[in-house]
From Swiss-Prot:
Biased composition (Acidic residues): 7-22
Record lineage: Eukaryota, Metazoa, Chordata, Craniata, Vertebrata
PROSITE patterns, alphabetized: GOLOCO
Lineage top rank: taxon: Eukaryota
Intracellular or extracellular location(s): Cytoplasm
Protein name: G-protein-signaling modulator 3
Tissue expression from the record: Expressed in heart, placenta, lung and liver.
Species of the source: Homo sapiens (Human)
Length: 160
């Protein structure tokens, strides 16, 4: 890709006035080389930080860079694109018949029973705090064994 040249160089104009050695006059805002940093603007003029011309070149360069990136990404996506062939026989695309309702219900009940068995197998009693067993034995002796058994409730049975 060739670098963009300013319009005045393409038109064949001489550009800003120069002295015998090819340097611009000291009060000029032009640069002798493209790679040289811009000269400070004369006092009282309002320019961007890069100067009016540099800012437009910067935006042009940014735009060209973004175009290159977009083109490269587009090519890369095209290279990675897979081809998809559809079969000529449309009957092979017909959906499979649905299973009867009984099969679905049986599958559901099988899954549910296996999950319930797993849950029951993984259950454990919560640990008692330190000294908890002695406290329970003391309460049992004080209140009497019969009264505690009368107040005890049965845990619900799991229907799984």
């Amino acid at each position: 890709m060739e670098a963009e040249r300013p319009q005045e160089e393409e038109d064949g104009e001489q550009g800003p006035p120069q002295d015998e050695e090819g340097w611009p006059p000291p009060n000029s805002t032009t640069r002798p080389w493209r790679s040289a940093p811009p000269s400070p603007p004369p006092p009282g003029t309002r320019h961007t930080a890069l100067g009016p011309r540099s800012a437009s070149l910067l935006s042009l360069q940014t735009e060209l860079l973004l175009d290159l990136v977009a083109e490269a990404q587009s090519r890369r996506l095209e290279e990675q694109r897979a081809t998809f062939y559809t079969p000529q026989n449309p009957s092979s695309l017909a959906p499979a018949p649905l299973r009867p309702l009984e099969d679905r219900e049986q599958l559901y009940s099988t899954i549910l029973s296996h999950q319930c068995q797993r849950m029951e197998a993984q259950r454990s009693e919560p640990p008692l705090p330190p000294g908890g067993q002695e406290l329970l034995e003391l309460l049992l002796r004080v209140q009497g064994g019969g009264r505690m058994e009368e107040q005890r409730s049965r845990p619900p049975t799991h229907t799984c």
